[in-house]
Each structure stands twice: as C-alpha cells, then as structure tokens.
Regions:
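C-terminal catalytic "cap/lid" subdomain
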Residues: 1-225
Length: 225
C-alpha cells in the first residue's frame, strides 16, 4: 500500500522504508520469482478523500493515479540502486516517465528478469488501486496476488478497534463476501473470485515476511475459492 511507504512520517515517502521494501523484493527476485508490483498513492493523495473535501471525483482520482506513478518511480529507483532491473509501466500515456502498459510488455519484461511496476491504476476514475492490482494480476496470469499491508492478515473485525477480533489463516471468497470483510473493495474481490486468483494478505512492514510468504510459510491470510 502507498500508505506503508510513509513509514514513521505523516506524509510522503520514508527513504528507510523504501530501501527495506527494495531489499525484500530483491531477495525474492534472486530466487527466480517473476514479480509484478502495483502500489497505491495514499501516502500522497487519495481521490475519494479529495472528493469529500469538494474536489471533483474524476480529477481527484486522476491526482491519485499520478501519486501512484510518483511512488512507482521511487520504488523503481530504490530497486535499481540494489542492482535489480526495474521497469515502470503506466496505464495512461506519459512517456518518457514510463512506458504505456500492455499485458505483453509486462510479461516480456518479467521473463527478461525485470521487476515490473504497473502504475496509474487502471487509467480510469472510480477504480481503486485494489481493483487495478486485481486486474493486472489477472491479465499477467499471476499465480497469486500478495497484498502487503500494515496488518498481518484478515480479522473478524478491525483488530486496532476490537480487541476480541480473531485472525483467519485461510478463508474463501464466498465467506469474505458473506461476512462483508474489508479485504479489498467489492469490485476487486469479485474480480479475483471470478478469475480464480488467490490472494495472500500479510504484513509487509515486518522485514523478512515477503520471503516467508514466497517460501510457503503460513503467515498472513490466504483467500481462495
């Protein structure tokens, strides 16, 4: 999530957190994993909260899309600094900042050993980053979607607000929808369900967790059909 990039800051990008993410991604990249990344923009601007303050929703969402491009460029630079090749693809044309996204370009880059960062959401307003990442995951025929957040999985209720909340290790999409759990927004959840794309929700802020998920350790929550 874009918000995770804030680290200890109130806003923007925490360079230490960015470097930690880059190192974790490098670690699994060196294991031969093909990686496509979609990152949010909540650390810079959220279209929906902008709309609540009187912004036109479409313009607000476009600002949010641009925020994801800023984060993608930052992550790309951090990855290159660790010696990993990274490519930013954008859902709207903005060469030379990034290349225009296509499924074939993304797959080609990943097969050539590059980490692909897919930015600017779906290129359309009214779609969240969750929906953007679900769409891209389905398009590039990913084996699994990893949703790195600030929480260590899916709970029966918000663990920050409800001390009795318990964590699911494993849950079906039907159960998520029935319980109204906020894993992702409804559109994204339904897309993953319909296209049989499993998700692992885990805490990305704990160093080493990404490698554990890839190694098959049971951390976070697996969502599947």
């Amino acid at each position: 999530s874009g918000e995770s990039l804030m680290g200890e800051k109130q806003y923007g990008i925490d360079e230490k957190r960015l470097a930690e993410y880059a190192e974790q991604i490098k670690e699994i990249h060196q294991q031969g994993v093909q990686i496509g990344i979609v990152i949010g923009g909540g650390n810079i601007f959220r279209g929906l909260s902008g709309a609540n303050k009187g912004f036109d929703r479409v313009k607000g969402d476009q600002m949010g899309m641009l925020a994801t491009v800023i984060n993608s460029l930052a992550l790309s630079s951090a990855l290159v600094a660790t010696g990993i090749k990274a490519r930013v693809l954008t859902a709207v044309r903005m060469e030379p900042i990034g290349e225009f996204y296509s499924k074939w370009k993304a797959i080609e880059c990943m097969e050539n050993g590059e980490v692909v960062i897919m930015s600017a959401g779906t290129g359309n307003p009214f779609f969240t980053t969750d929906t953007g990442s679900s769409l891209r995951g389905i398009e590039i025929e990913a084996d699994v979607m990893l949703k790195g957040t600030r929480v260590d999985g899916i709970y029966t209720a918000d663990p920050e607000k409800d001390p009795t909340a318990t964590k699911f290790d494993d849950i079906t999409y039907d159960e998520v929808l029935k319980r109204g759990l906020k894993v992702m927004d409804l559109t994204a959840t339904c897309m993953c369900k319909e296209n049989n794309l499993p998700i692992v929700v885990f805490d990305m802020d704990t160093v080493g967790n990404l490698k554990k998920v890839i190694s098959g350790e049971e951390i976070g929550t697996l969502v599947h059909n």
